[in-house]
Each structure stands twice: as C-alpha cells, then as structure tokens.
C-alpha cells in the first residue's frame, strides 16, 4: 500500500540496514550471527539444573552464547560469520545457517553429554558491529528532528534497553542524564573503505579464530 506518515521527529533504528545510508556505512561492519536449536530435552536439562531460560555467553570475540527455551530446547549461537561487502544485506543473511555444522560442533564441545541430541533448526541474521563494540546515538547531520541508534554489535538485548531510554530523551528534547550519556555523539573510529574493509575483515576474523582455537 502507498501512503505517507507525518511526524515531528523520526528515529532511525535500522540495525545492519543502516549501512544503506552513506553516512553510516563506515561506522560498522555487517557480519552474521548463526544459531542452532536442539530438539526439546526438558528432562535432560532438568537433570543438570538448567532451567528458566538462563542465558550464558563467554568472553570470546567470536562469542558463543546460548540459552534454553520454554519448551526445553537449547538455542546456541556463535559470532564471526559471513561478512557483507559494502554492508549489503543479501540472501546470505537470512534463512538456515550455512555454519550450522560449525555451531553444532561448538555446542557439543561444551556439552559432550548432549552430543546425541538432534538439531531441529538453524538460522542466520546480520548484526552491525562497530569498531569498539559499543552502540552510538545522535542526530543525523544538522537535523535535530532525525535521530539514530545503531551499532549494538550483536549484544542488543541489554544495551537496547539503555538505547531506548537515550532515544526517548533525545526525541522528547529532554536535558537529562540519558540525553547527555557518553554514547550520544561519542567519537567513533571509521572502518577502512572497501575493498580494504572486506579483505581485512576476513584476515582479522581468521586470525582471531586461530587464536581462540589455540586457547
């Protein structure tokens, strides 16, 4: 349907798709996160005391993160997937994960007693990874009526709560601790232009993977 919306202020909360806007394109890289989900095993999870959707993550750069679901599955994810050239989010960033075998291997390495549990599904999706791993907020150019929040870097569940408070204060024109938070208009390093960013991303990712396998 065609139509129009009129508003006094607009918030751009576009995740990885903010790369379509030229001024944001070098603020972050678009890279995939990949997840697998096991078959339901509520009784086996109860045996090891893993209940109530407890979420866990490690401190790797190519992070492993996982939690249980309400029907007793394990949803297990891994960072460091597909890189997008020029931030273009294409078909490689949706649907079943092309890294399902790799992610499953990480799950079974951490929980060898569950190695016999089948994988029911997998999926992939893009994230917007900034140089620092921290999100950024502000106004678009000299337009105080167009605000943005981006760069959650795959850690959006917690920081997006803070981001919502920041964007609400900016949208309402408040002068409070949220509108003046350090993440607002924070200096941020740009990634190199393409193709250096794309090629360099592959090199860095491979080096980090080797380092973390050796640890």
Write out the residue ranges for each language-model feature.
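C-terminal lid/capping helical subdomain adjacent to the catalytic/cofactor pocket in oxidative enzymes
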Residues: 142-148, 152-215
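Active-site substrate-recognition segment that forms the wall
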Residues: 3-43, 47-144
